[in-house]
Amino acid sequence: MRRVVSLLSGLLVVLLVLSSAPGAAAENWARFRGPGGAGISHDKGLPVTWTDKDYRWKTALPGLGHSSVCVWDNQLFVTSALDSGRQRLVFSLDSKSGKILWSDKLASRTHSKHQLNSFASATPASDGRRVYVLFSTNEDTVVRAYDFKGQRLWQADVGPFHNKHGHGCGTSPIVWHDTVIVASQHDGPSSIVGLDAATGKLRWKSDRQVRLTAHSTPVVLERKNKTPQLFFSNTGDGIGSIDPRNGNVLWRANLFTTRAVNSPVIAGNLVLAIAGGGGKGKQMAAIPVDQSGEVASDKVAWTRERNLPYVPTPLAFGNHLYFWADNGVVTCLESATGKDVWMQRVGGKYWASPICVDGKIYNITDKGEVVVLASGAKYQLLGRTQLGEPVHSTPAVSQGRMFLRTFKHLYCLEAGKK
C-alpha cells in the first residue's frame, strides 16, 4: 500500500511539474505558422462563420506590417513599421483583452521593396523565455531579443539583405532549443546562421549560394535516434538539409531555377518545397527526408508544375496536402504520391498561408475575406466571413483563440462564441 501511495505521489509531482512549465497548459503559436511551422492547431470550438459581435476584442495597431502574431501563454507579439520603414515597431499585447502591454522602436532606414510587401513582414519567434524579432534593410539584417516585459536583451546583425528587384525581406526567425536560426538568403553573399538565444552570439554559419533572393522560412524535423534536420529552400540549393546543432550541410537537391518564396513543408517521411516567379512558371518537388550529399533526381518521390502556390505555404494534414494557390485555386493531393484528390476555385487573391484548426482549413483573401474549408477527400465549403480590411498576414491560433491581423487592426476570435 505504501508503495502504491509513493508511486501516486511521484506521479502527482511529475504532473505538477509538467503543468507548471511554461506553455504546458496549451499549445503556443510561437513562430510563423505555429508549432513546427506546420500550420496546425488542435484547438476546438472556433467558428467557421461569425459577425463583428463575436470578436472578443479588436485593437488598432499603429503603422503597417504583414508579420503574423506570435503567441506564448497569454502574451502576443507582433511587428509593424512607420515612416517608410525608418521606424520599426514591436508590440506585445494581452491575449485576453487586446491591451498593448508594451512597445518598442528600432530606428532603421527606408529601402525599396515590393509594393505588396511591408517593412515588417517577419513574424516574431519565442521560446517562452524571450521573444526574437527580425528587421532588414539593404545594409543590415537585425535580430533583437526582448524579455516578456519589453526589456531589450541583445541585438545582432547577420549581414545585409540585397535584392536587385527591391522586394524586401520575407523570411522569419525560428527558435530550435537554445538557438535562434535566421535564413538570410538574398542577392549577395548569403547564409543561414544559428545564434545563441541567450546572448545573440554566433554559434554557426552555413554559407549558401542562393542566386535569387529567397523568402522561405526553414522548418526542423526531430526524430528519436536520428540526426535533426533543418530544411530550407532556395534557387542555388533547391531543397537542402542542415544539422541545426552545428550548421553542417547534410544533403541538398539542386532542382530549382526560380526563387523560393513559400516555406518547406514536412509531410510524413517527405519534405517538399516550391519555387517560382513572374511568368517563368513554378516548380515543386517532394523528397524522402533521409538523404545524404548531392541528391540525384531519381531519389525524388514526385514533382509537380501546375496549380502551385507562389506565396502561400502548402498545408500537410493527415494523408493529404493542400495547395492554396495565390489565385484562389485550392488543390487537395495525396501526400505520398502527389495524385490529385480534388480541385476547386474558391475565389480571391491570397498572400496569407492556410492553417488547419480542428480539421478545418482557414485562409484569408487580400481583401479580408476568411474562407473556411473542410479537410479530407471531399471538397466542402464551410463558411465565408468578411473582415472588411486588407490582409496579408497568416492567422495564428492558441488557447482557443484565433488572431487575425489586418492592415489596421488585430482581431481576437474566441472558441464557443458562435
Language model feature labels by segment:
Residues M1-V4:
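Positively charged n-region of N-terminal signal peptides that target proteins for export
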Residues L8-S20:
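Bacterial N-terminal signal peptides
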Residues P22-K418:
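Noncatalytic, solvent-exposed loop/strand surfaces
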